[in-house]
Amino acid sequence: MCIRDSCNPNNPTSSALNTEEITKILTHCKLHDIFVMIDETYVEFAPDIDTISAVSLTTKFDNFMILRGTSKFFCAPGLRLGYGICGNLAFLERMNSIKNPWTVNTLAALAGEAMFMDTDYIQTTKDYIQSERTRCIDILSKRDNLKIYPAYANFILVKLLDGTTSFEMFERCIKSGLMIRDCASFHGLDGEFIRFCIQKKEDNDRLLNLLTL
């Protein structure tokens, strides 16, 4: 059996596959005995989770597993808390039989329960990210020197079209106390691509000013 992994929404492009596209992939992989791991670490940031999450497909396919965590949406990377969703009970039983004991510590277990019950935080965060993401894309899309890609996660991929390199833009932002990602190290992206995360509105405004100089 082969294993194929996919990140949805994707990092660093922030693009996403919808459930129809995922269904085609899973169908093809099943025919070729390929097990698929779908990383949905950023899925909570998506405008409409149901249109891109593969959770609904766990009752139809047994050749894939969804991976999620709390490091991004809940800003808790130190907890090392993640979880999987899978409709293949035999696969889950096999995993449980060989996994290390105590894979989740007591603090992470308690924090995890509190996080997922905090519906106010969840909705407020989703609303803020969606609002600021849309605002930033609208502003940047009006600039001829930038190409903005559709975003489903909490970050936006930008291509610089005026000859400025991603490293030069990175340095410009660092000097202003702002951090962006130079995407030159990502396979398939050259020195013209940057990625930035949605932050506080005032920081977003500072970054927008730098990008539109």
For each of these PLM feature ranges, what is it?
Residues M1-I3:
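Short, small-residue-biased leader/transition segments that mark boundaries at the very start
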Residues E20, K175-L178, S185-L213:
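PLP-dependent enzyme catalytic core of the Aspartate aminotransferase-like
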Residues N88, L161-T164, K200-D203:
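Helix N-cap motif at beta-to-alpha junctions
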Residues P12-F35, E40-F73:
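Active-site pre-lysine segment of PLP-dependent enzymes
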Residues N63-Y149:
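PLP-dependent aminotransferase class I/II
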Residues I129-Q130, R143-S176:
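Conserved PLP-binding catalytic core of the aspartate aminotransferase-like
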Residues I85, L157-K159, C197-Q199:
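Short hydrophobic/aromatic beta-strand micro-patches
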